[in-house]
């Protein structure tokens, strides 16, 4: 049984955010607010969502992108973080798993995900 005050706080947090619906296998672009000293800027992080975990305000998602020299870079974002300015879904992927950790071992064209076709 959860505390009613925590539930009401989480409900208020969830209502204020405009987050698109996405799943593992989708290519997303996350605009993250970064503070460096007294300056603040927005940095885009584009990659494949390979996992979504948790529930409520503690929900997180993992994005994997290929960096320089074909090195995979993974980053975990809290879904309802204040540092996330926006999330944009670029492509819907067709996958049959909720966690795509097997992509870590695949290289090049083998690591591609087919696009979901709408009928």
UniProtKB/Swiss-Prot annotation:
Keywords: Ribonucleoprotein, Ribosomal protein. One of its GO terms (cellular component) is cytosolic large ribosomal subunit. One of its GO terms (biological process) is translation. PROSITE patterns: RIBOSOMAL_L19. GO terms for molecular function: structural constituent of ribosome. InterPro entries: Ribosomal_bL19, Ribosomal_bL19_CS, Ribosomal_bL19_sf, Translation_prot_SH3-like_sf. It holds the Pfam family Ribosomal_L19. Belongs to the bacterial ribosomal protein bL19 family. This protein is located at the 30S-50S ribosomal subunit interface and may play a role in the structure and function of the aminoacyl-tRNA binding site. This is Large ribosomal subunit protein bL19. It comes from Sulfurovum sp. (strain NBC37-1).
């Amino acid at each position: 049984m959860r505390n009613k005050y925590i539930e009401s706080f989480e409900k208020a947090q969830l209502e204020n955010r405009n987050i698109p619906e996405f799943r593992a296998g989708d290519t997303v672009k996350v605009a993250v607010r970064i503070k460096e000293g007294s300056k603040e800027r927005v940095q885009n992080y584009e990659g494949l969502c390979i996992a979504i975990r948790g529930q409520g305000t503690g929900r997180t998602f993992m994005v994997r992108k290929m960096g320089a020299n074909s090195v995979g870079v993974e980053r975990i974002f809290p879904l309802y973080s204040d540092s996330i300015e926006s999330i944009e879904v670029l492509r819907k992927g067709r996958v049959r798993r909720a966690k795509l950790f097997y992509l870590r071992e695949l290289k090049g064209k083998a690591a591609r995900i087919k696009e979901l076709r709408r009928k």
